[in-house]
Amino acid sequence: MSSTLSVPAQAPETGTARVKRGMAEQLKGGVIMDVVTPEQAKIAEDAGAVAVMALERVPADIRKDGGVARMSDPDMIEGIISAVSIPVMAKSRIGHFVEAQVLQSLGVDYIDESEVLTPADEVNHSDKWAFTTPFVCGATNLGEALRRIAEGAAMIRSKGEAGTGNVVEAVRHLRQIKNEIARLRGYDNNELYAAAKELRAPYEIVKEVAELGKLPVVLFSAGGVATPADAALMRQLGAEGVFVGSGIFKSGDPAKRAAAIVKATTFYDDPKIIADASRNLGEAMVGINCDTLPEAERYANRGW
């Protein structure tokens, strides 16, 4: 009589860097939209968003209202999770790892350690390796991006200036990151060691970026994207997707604008499709000239 040995089923990997980065990879090419109600979340999903960001106030309102901006109410987040089938993100304050723990317990798909909220720690960001939920973090330059990756971030977004409806800072930050990556490509090991010191980032990650010619995680763009052309611009500059905050639900026709931005993000290299997507969208959100913003009101300066 022959016998067969049963091999115990191997538990699936959870919470590893490979798994968390793989989850973020699934969002490539898409649009992530800020929403404040389940109804807005459904509009975003129907428009083709790959994920939604659940928060109580969009950045434009946070900027207008002032005060301390904190993690959103758990009931509101759970209401949005229940309303849609696409992934749901939520924001924690920089360095507020307990807010991040709460968000993980709620079952959000991604945590955004966000400069849009008021930082809780002026020295430390959260240790993202301590979580099974993947983190998204903002960056204005390559050094900032690599420091967040070293802390465990599974996705980077160039910061831009949230809540302004002005894409100029998004362009500046994405170009800065891409240009600094290109500069590393021709470096030998000695130069990479010097670059790591200059960037204040681990040598191993700097070397990996030089070899890949890109970040080892997904790179999206955020902050000021308000029109289909804005979204296509960021994609043509090298963003692998876009976040849209106030630009949709502060506009005249949110559902139509949301669908148009998704279409332009997908067909970002086809001017005719972008033109068609841009027709008859109603009023865009009221923009802010970033040059007039006082230093203390520049969200992109938060983080280090």
Swiss-Prot record:
Keywords: Lyase, Pyridoxal phosphate, Schiff base
Domain of life of the source: Bacteria
Keyword Hydrolase assigned: no
Active-site residues annotated for this sequence: 91 (schiff-base intermediate with d-ribose 5-phosphate)
EC number: 4.3.3.6
Pathway connected to this protein: Cofactor biosynthesis; pyridoxal 5'-phosphate biosynthesis
Binding residues for D-ribose 5-phosphate: 34, 163, 224, 245-246
Binding-site positions, D-glyceraldehyde 3-phosphate: 175
GO molecular function annotation: pyridoxal 5'-phosphate synthase (glutamine hydrolysing) activity
Substrates-to-products reaction catalysed: aldehydo-D-ribose 5-phosphate + D-glyceraldehyde 3-phosphate + L-glutamine = pyridoxal 5'-phosphate + L-glutamate + phosphate + 3 H2O + H(+)
Top-rank EC class of the record's enzyme: lyase
InterPro entries xref list: Aldolase_TIM (IPR013785), PdxS/SNZ (IPR001852), PdxS/SNZ_N (IPR033755), RibuloseP-bd_barrel (IPR011060)
Any one Gene Ontology BP term: pyridoxine biosynthetic process
PANTHER family, alphabetized: PYRIDOXAL 5'-PHOSPHATE SYNTHASE SUBUNIT SNZ1-RELATED (PTHR31829:SF0)
Alphabetical list of HAMAP family matching this protein: PdxS (MF_01824)
Annotated family: Belongs to the PdxS/SNZ family.
Its biological purpose: Catalyzes the formation of pyridoxal 5'-phosphate from ribose 5-phosphate (RBP), glyceraldehyde 3-phosphate (G3P) and ammonia. The ammonia is provided by the PdxT subunit. Can also use ribulose 5-phosphate and dihydroxyacetone phosphate as substrates, resulting from enzyme-catalyzed isomerization of RBP and G3P, respectively.
Subunit-level organization: In the presence of PdxT, forms a dodecamer of heterodimers.
UniProt-recorded name of the protein: Pyridoxal 5'-phosphate synthase subunit PdxS
